UniProtKB/Swiss-Prot annotation:
This is Lipoyl synthase. It holds the Pfam family LIAS_N. [4Fe-4S] cluster 2 binds at C94, C98, C101. It is found in: Cytoplasm. Pathway: Protein modification; protein lipoylation via endogenous pathway; protein N(6)-(lipoyl)lysine from octanoyl-[acyl-carrier-protein]: step 2/2. NCBIfam families: lipA, PRK05481.1, PRK12928.1. Its main location: cytoplasm. Its EC number is 2.8.1.8. It catalyses: [[Fe-S] cluster scaffold protein carrying a second [4Fe-4S](2+) cluster] + N(6)-octanoyl-L-lysyl-[protein] + 2 oxidized [2Fe-2S]-[ferredoxin] + 2 S-adenosyl-L-methionine + 4 H(+) = [[Fe-S] cluster scaffold protein] + N(6)-[(R)-dihydrolipoyl]-L-lysyl-[protein] + 4 Fe(3+) + 2 hydrogen sulfide + 2 5'-deoxyadenosine + 2 L-methionine + 2 reduced [2Fe-2S]-[ferredoxin]. It comes from Salmonella typhi. One of its GO terms (cellular component) is cytoplasm.
Length: 321
């Protein structure tokens, strides 16, 4: 019998090391079993990387993290080249170990009390008008990190009064009441929490999370702030069916969610969950039409769409795909 892995605080566990800690075991994908990417999934890199390197340098200077880098987002080059980024607070080590996600797992260090001010100054220096703030899961904190979110929102607005702030929050498992009490006092301009996939394969895709809990979080925030858009997103290609996706969309509308994102799942490494199918642009267009017919005010649906992809345009109701 193998000895249990003892995690050291502050150490990032990735790929095989991370997957070894997941209760639902995933079989490493052999190279010849990988699905070939279709033409529509091939991303062109910008010829000039000056802006990209500038944003990375600003992050490093202030000890900040972006989910774009930590989660290996395929849109990083495009977004950084346009001067946009999704900031990830509360460190770069997640207490969860979802097998679709490339963010490192482990025992995180204490939150940086100076991070809200450093984040606010960086955003002001970049002259951003719309910013997305997300975080790793912090099940080690009594409020799940909600107060840190609130502190960041307050600091950002103090330095950039005209800015619009979208928060992409974790599920605050076991801490919803405390977290919402804090966030209700300092709400963002858009409240985002991703369901990620469909109930049938939830335990495999999001071990440690609960589908109905996430729906309740979105519903309760909307009840407290009916004027603030609520948003959620799914990855497709993990084994779900289009019919199941449509049913999740109905669940989201029943819980008051007004904005939707749907994008293609891409396997970060052979140790992560494999891609089961590539959904065509035409299928995404059909699901977008279904979403708008259900009453979503905006639906960004396309192979390269991610939750915060062109989030400023999404918030304005402009076409994103």
């Amino acid at each position: 019998m193998s000895k249990p892995i003892v995690m050291e605080r502050g150490v990032k566990y990735r790929d095989a090391d991370k997957m070894a800690l997941i209760p639902v075991k995933n079989v490493v994908t052999e190279r010849d079993a990988l699905l070939r990417k279709p033409e529509w999934m091939k991303i062109k890199l910008p010829a000039d990387s000056t802006r990209i390197q500038g944003i990375k340098a600003a992050m490093r200077k202030n000890g900040l993290h972006s989910v774009c880098e930590e989660a290996s987002c395929p849109n990083l080059a495009e977004c950084f080249n346009h001067g946009t980024a999704t900031f990830m607070i509360l460190g770069a080590i997640c207490t969860r170990r979802c097998p679709f996600c490339d963010v490192a797992h482990g025992r995180p260090v204490a939150p940086d009390a100076e991070e809200p001010q450093k984040l606010a100054q960086t955003i002001a220096d970049m002259a951003l008008r719309y910013v997305v703030i997300t975080s790793v899961d912090r099940d080690d904190l009594r409020d799940g990190g909600a107060q840190h979110f609130a502190d960041c929102i307050t600091a950002i607005r103090a330095k950039s009064p005209e800015i619009k702030i979208e928060t992409l929050v974790p599920d605050f498992r076991g801490r919803m009441d405390r977290a919402l009490d804090i966030l209700n006092a300092t709400p963002p301009d858009v409240f985002n929490h991703n369901l990620e996939n469909v109930p049938r394969i939830y335990r495999q895709v999001r071990p440690g999370a609960d589908y109905n809990w996430s729906l309740k979080l979105l519903e309760r925030f909307k009840e407290a702030h009916p004027e603030i858009p609520t948003k959620s997103g799914l990855m497709v290609g993990l084994g779900e069916t289009n019919a199941e996706i449509i049913e999740v969309m109905r669940d989201l509308r029943r819980h008051g969610v007004t904005m939707l994102t749907l994008g293609q799942y891409l396997q970060p490494s052979r140790h992560h969950l494999p891609v089961q199918r590539y959904v065509s642009p035409e299928e995404f267009d059909e699901m977008k039409a279904e979403a708008l017919a259900m009453g979503f005010t905006h639906a960004a649906c396309g192979p390269c769409v991610r939750s915060s992809y062109h989030a400023d345009l999404q918030a304005k109701g402009m076409e994103v795909k």
